[in-house]
Amino acid sequence: DDRKMDTLLTLFGQTEAEAIRQGNVKMQGMVYGNTIISHINRNEYDKIIQKAPGYLDFYILHEQWKLYYQIHMQLITAYNLKGDYKKAAEEAKLMFDRAKARKDKAGMATALYATAITYNVQDRWKEEEDCFRECIRLLWEVSGYDNILTQAYAFLCSSLRAQGQYDKLLQLVPEYEKAIARFEKAAGRTQPEAWGNLYVALMNTYIDTKDYDKAGEYLAKLEGIVNNNISRYELARAKALILQSRGDYRKALAAIDSAAVEVQESEFDLNAVRKIKMEILTRMGRFDEAFTLFDTIIAANDTIKDVEINARFDELRTQYEVEKHIAEKERNLHYFLFTLGICLVLALLLTATFYYNRIIALKNH
């Protein structure tokens, strides 16, 4: 809530002042990074746009490049979510040019990743595909960016699916699997979220190509993942389509009603659900209900046309919920490391730090 955020920002301000007094630029950089992360968690994109440029200058001055790329990425994301694609593209180009001047392949790849996302939110699929392919090529040549590499593959699959390039998508699977294996080896643990992204791509590909038996295999894999963080809407929608293909209309109808519950705030997704439900009702011979639903779809289309950009972001949120989950886990780790650093070098802030630890513990719980 606002009170906790105010407390957190006060703590960051005190820590920044102490870091400056001690000449601890590493801690100062961490403060700025965690400030941006705090605003991300609250969807405060204007705050990110206001603060990030100054922080980026600090990172450049002190050559804290990994933090620079992470925070510049968040600035680009903020512009995208504000709908300012021109500014997002300008920032991505600036980020790429700086990385290229340093011959930093990881930085160049991160900039290409950000550029590809800007193309994605504008439905510029081919340009998105080209960016992600180059991003992936560069990331195979560096280490420490396996999470971004597997996410790039997930986005690339979405781009190929949007273009109907199903053969290319399936050809991508072996190297996608190798990327996940490399990620697991580097992390020392399994990566169910990364596998989940791959299974979603394959499940939806087989649904699109009407191979419902294959789609069912990947749906089962997704449902078998422990701590499954795949969108429940995505799973319910797939289950409804697969059950419909098998003629089990009663269960299909229950599944699609379950999907509708998950997307009440998105008229875009609700209409997609209604279209599937209308087809199921028609196959069941419940024509009056199907026609009523058809009228609802037509009426909703006018609303959707007026809020097309917002609807597009609702779709993105559904597609990339796994990525959000990964990012949240990384943010929690950043908070932990940051708090530990305060305990070690900032004894003057011990009381404030203890309170901050309690906040994070409650959040994690």
Language-model features and meaning:
Residues 197, 201-299:
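Membrane-proximal low-complexity regions enriched in glycine and acidic/polar residues
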Residues 13-17, 53-60, 93-100, 133-144, ...:
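Amphipathic alpha-helical segments of tetratricopeptide repeats
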Residues 6-9, 46, 250, 257-260, ...:
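Hydrophobic positions within repeat-based interaction scaffolds
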Residues 27, 34, 67, 74, ...:
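"A position-specific structural signal for the A-helix of alpha-solenoid helical repeats
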